[in-house]
Amino acid sequence: MVRTIVCDLDGSLMNPSSGIYVNEAVKEALIEVEKKNILVILNSARCFQGVYPLSKQILMQDFGCNGAHCLDVKMKKTMFEYVISNNDVSSIWQYAQKHNLGVGYSQPGYFVANKMTHGFELDMHNCDVDYILTNHMEKYLKDSVWKMSISDSKENIDLIYDSMKDHIESNCNVKVVHSTDTMIDIIHKDCEKLNSVNRLLKNLEISWKDVSSIGDGSSDASVLEASGLGVTLENGCEACKKVAKKIVPSCYEDGCIEWLKEL
């Protein structure tokens, strides 16, 4: 019996980079699932601002989780978080500045960056998050940092990625992830989707066998494999298709609805 569903967003519940809300048909299907007393967990690499509006759209009353920050939506209370230290934020900022790269860090109400790039512009619109541009990194560093990003052209990112990853991971307590062609995401080294969901399920005393999950990216594969019913889409990566117990039509066809209606 499925007690909980774990949902990736971009490429699963919605088309990649398509804004902060799901299509109306997907919204209604998710609400019907919630009416069956099935717990919904949103498990996205997006920053908080790109996930929270969706939780309100689908009338979520329980938990939202983007890996680095797990929020009880009903109580508006942080359950746990994986925080990048201020020293590491400063070190990464200085490294990016030295190499003339765009760099920024998350805050609960905004994102702070040294300059606007194409990648940051896409993120600003996709997550509906306000960007503050500054040369003074420490001025706006008021709360926990759950994610940093480095952004530049695809050519520059491809050129510097390997050496940048080695340098940053060797000197800071973080993990460097090639997120998109123009964006590098940086998170705490212990933060990943599987670890975060596992930690949440233990808190809630829910077994993985009672979980159904959906995802399309490589970071989703371990979650699908651990779940009682792991589902991917036709647009899913090979790693997801290898471990999924069910494959539904692509996100461009709202394939997740087939899965939601069968729960």
What are these language model-derived features?
Residues 22-120:
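Active-site phosphate-binding/coordination module
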Residues 1-7, 35, 206:
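Non-catalytic pre-domain segments flanking phosphatase-related domains
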